[in-house]
């Protein structure tokens, strides 16, 4: 549960929330390696553990909602769709390929119909959800928002979309992975569910996989909890502990990485080899002139910047996204970079050398 009267800063909450409270307790939450518990009838898959609870309390306080942890971000996404059981999902046409693949499979099996929209065109999104509601009823429609989008960093008018969806009694899911709980708190705008791949910025060290959901709707929370139980999508004890430890420094890491990304983006926008560049927080996308061949050469030539597919760690990573079948619609020269916390001049020196290749 969250503290609704919590006026502390995010930096303070990240450090203090989710700690043991009793005298002589350890300072940090313990790694509880248990599936079964004496006498009470508790079972970890059903009732959770104190390690999960500590992480969920801390993330819940940052986001302002009730939190549940899952094995991965995709497990969280699957649980949301299981819990909400929509007939139509309105989803950004450019968004995380894992969720789009899941929705595509569900559509192929006749479980859902997917309507793709340009998420920055608020009028078109509202029109799409109203049309879906008129067709199947508001309770069978979900608006799935990803902002900023992966990998193009499009930014939705989040508050306006949440208000419009709520006015039509349509449930809204916000994948806030790129923004993290530091960049935005969609529950404040009336989102029904917020999800994170905690594998990314929350964990922050590229050493775990975990997913998180948050909601202020008691009925939805119970459905999500039920989904976690019946799907068996529970987090590991070590993963929950590492995610909580990563959360302790999230505000500092996010701030430092954002500062670096702002500066790298500023320099890229005037670089002769670059067609376009944009960053939102630590996430930076840019298009290399010369298309796929030139972009691949940049990735191959960089030495300190790591070519890797995930993001949100302390290290700077990048990759050309259009090489993946699910991102075939993306500009072939687009490189998505997750800017880390290294010295900005070292990042720039490596990138500048790669661009000159």
Residue positions per predicted region:
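Short amphipathic alpha-helices in soluble, non-transmembrane regions
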Residues: 224, 296-303, 350-355
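Short loop segments at secondary-structure junctions
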Residues: 36-37, 215-220, 247, 287-293
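Conserved PLP-enzyme active-site core in the AAT-like
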Residues: 2-6, 16, 23, 67-278
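Conserved C-terminal alpha-helix-loop-beta "cap" of PLP-dependent enzymes
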Residues: 280-335, 339
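PLP-dependent enzyme catalytic core of the Aspartate aminotransferase-like
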Residues: 8-11, 113-115, 126-135, 168, ...
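A short, N-terminal amphipathic alpha-helix
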Residues: 58-63, 267
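N-terminal "arm"/small-domain region of PLP-dependent enzymes with the aminotransferase-like
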Residues: 1-58
């Amino acid at each position: 549960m969250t503290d609704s009267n919590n006026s502390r800063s995010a930096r303070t909450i990240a450090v203090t929330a989710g700690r043991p409270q009793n005298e002589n307790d350890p300072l940090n939450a313990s790694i509880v390696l248990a599936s079964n518990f004496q006498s009470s009838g508790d079972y970890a898959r059903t009732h959770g553990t104190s390690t999960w609870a500590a992480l969920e309390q801390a993330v819940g306080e940052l986001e302002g909602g009730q939190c549940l942890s899952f094995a991965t971000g995709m497990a969280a996404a699957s649980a949301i769709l299981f819990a909400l059981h929509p007939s139509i999902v309105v989803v950004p046409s450019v968004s995380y390929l894992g969720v789009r693949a899941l929705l595509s499979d569900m559509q192929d099996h006749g479980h859902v119909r997917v309507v793709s929209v340009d998420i920055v065109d608020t009028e078109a999104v509202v029109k799409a959800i109203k049309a879906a509601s008129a067709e199947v009823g508001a309770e069978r429609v979900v608006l799935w928002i990803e902002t900023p989008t992966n990998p193009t960093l499009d930014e939705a008018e989040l508050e306006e979309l949440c208000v419009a969806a709520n006015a039509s009694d349509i449930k809204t899911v916000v994948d806030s992975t790129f923004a993290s709980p530091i960049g935005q708190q969609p529950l404040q705008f009336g989102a029904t569910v917020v999800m994170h791949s905690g594998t990314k910025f929350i964990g922050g060290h590229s050493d775990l996989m975990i997913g998180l959901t948050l909601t202020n709707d008691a009925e939805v929370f119970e459905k999500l909890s039920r989904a976690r139980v019946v799907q068996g999508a529970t987090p590991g004890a070590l993963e929950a502990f590492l995610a909580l430890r990563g959360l302790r420094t999230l505000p500092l890491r996010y701030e430092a990485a954002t500062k670096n990304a702002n500066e790298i983006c500023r320099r890229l926008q005037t670089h002769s080899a670059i067609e376009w560049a944009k960053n939102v927080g630590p996430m930076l996308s840019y298009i290399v002139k010369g298309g796929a061949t030139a972009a691949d050469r940049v990735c191959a030539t960089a030495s300190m910047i790591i070519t890797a597919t995930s993001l949100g760690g302390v290290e700077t990573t990048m990759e050309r996204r259009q090489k993946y079948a699910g991102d075939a619609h993306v500009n072939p020269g687009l490189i998505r970079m997750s800017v880390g916390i290294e010295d900005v001049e070292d990042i720039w020196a490596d990138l500048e050398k790669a661009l000159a290749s």
